[in-house]
Swiss-Prot record:
<protein>
    <recommendedName>
        <fullName>Protein FAM228A</fullName>
    </recommendedName>
</protein>
<dbReference type="InterPro" id="IPR040046">
    <property type="entry name" value="FAM228"/>
</dbReference>
<feature type="region of interest" description="Disordered">
    <location>
        <begin position="259"/>
        <end position="297"/>
    </location>
</feature>
<comment type="similarity">
    <text>Belongs to the FAM228 family.</text>
</comment>
Amino acid sequence: MSNCGKHFGPEQLEKWPELESVTLMEALAREDIDEAVYAILFRENCIAKRLDTYFQHLDAFKERKKELLHKKWTENVAKPLQQRIMEKVISYKALEKTKQENFEYFLKHTNKTEIIFGDFYDPEVYNPFYMTKKDPNYGKVAVPPFCDPLFIRQQEIDEEQRAVFQYTTGKRCTLKEFKELEKARQYARLPQFTFSLHSMVSKDRPKAFARPVGSKTHSKCSPEKLVCAEEKFPPYKVKMTSDVNQTVFERRFYSSKISQESKRHEKKGLALGTGQHRPRSWAAGEGQQRRRSQPVDRRVMTAEVLGQHLAALQLGDR
């Protein structure tokens, strides 16, 4: 109540403005608001107009860009392609025209003269080789060379390897010589396998395996087998060759010869009754044990006999 009395008291009511002044103030306020709104709307209209002009300019720029690109395409792609097509068509028409002229020329002269066949013709009247003399490539078909991509890639690899070989060794060689050298290297890298039942004994190994003559050996081999083992690879027949194929061939030859001689000795022993043959056992374990132990005994006897043979040869040379 105290607050209301302060604002609405008789003294305060006298200080209030009159009605005319209030209406004037309201009118001025409305004018100010209208001016502010007009300014805002004017700015919005200006911005909208500028945006419209910008978008129109952008559309025109894009259209112009498309026109320029189309012009460049027509100048660089379409016109040259069309010109080539026209040249091809014109050349084809010219070829057809020349063919037609030649055919008319042939018909005219055949109508004037008699029938032409074989080698009987008059070159003054009609020459069937007229076009070949005029154009040496007339009637010939040119086939482009076949290019295999795998073959080309292999040639490139060979050339690279040859260049590396020349750079490392400093020797110049042709591609054929380089391939021959590569083949020789591959053959040299191959391991020297023996394709016979017994391994070949070198000159140094019999010394290690050699035993004195009076020593006793516990082996179950017959005398015929010992003779075969002694005759296998005699030192005076073995030749050290650098060719792998030659050594393999010699080993096969010696092994086949030894097998034939062993069969002959066995047949002779059976005929004379000297060979002691035990009947084959039906037990699986005994047969497997005999098969496993047999090549070991034969190898030991082979090394021993070869060592004795080498010692005898050395004594004979002395």
